[in-house]
Amino acid sequence: MTAGDAEATVLPGNGGRIGGLRVGGTELLRQGERYGCFPMVPWCGRIRDGRFSDGAVVHQMPLNSPPHAIHGTVRDAAWRTARVSGNEAVLTYDLVDPWPYTGRVTQVIALAEDALTLTMSVETYESSFPAQIGWHPWFNRTLDGGSGAGAEIAFDPAWQEERGDDHLPTGNRVEPKPGPWDDCFGMPDGIDVTLTWPGRLELRVTSPEQWVVVYDEQEAAVCVEPQTGPPNGLNTLPRLVTPLEPLEATATWAWRRL
């Protein structure tokens, strides 16, 4: 997809992920083994021991990050292309085993000259179930593989979810601490995080949602992950998808040259 000098590559067959985002020929998303931006659904981050409850029923998910289950079931699956144009792609995925409920995920990726807007929804036509939506981008720490100044992160969260030794929130909210981070933060007025590559580009990640995970412990990448709830949220803060009320979320990456 193209808009002005912005170009985005979408990979329906590889988890419905954004494979690359180039602005003026400069790649903003990490390439290689962990790359692009993948959707996290029907949960974000880790579920404790891979188990979540829906009423009296306990469901077990595969432990793909032992001892926990991480990042949902769709990031390696093949999505269907419902519609595509020069600057917008609409993808769908029907939830299947190991997720215990039937439902449909729809993702819309829309490119403008100065922004990329991501929208996702989860619908059910049968049983209600808890779910989460999020995105996991791998932004390049430095642009063009250079040795210049790395991306600087600026945001003003209201709190930080205290992280336990098991990498999951303890349930305590604490004052935000300095990085490096692999942590979830609360932004009750909406997510607003700015990445700045000094002298090159500023990219602002915004969303009406209230939780964002910031992960900058890797040398080559910085992750800013908007999501509809905290890690382990299927257990601690479930949001129900019902036949009358789908779960919906949106996030925007807007950039400007410096």
Show the residue positions of the predicted features:
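Hydrophobic residues positioned within well-ordered beta-strands of beta-sheet architectures
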Residues: 89-91, 105-107, 118, 133, ...
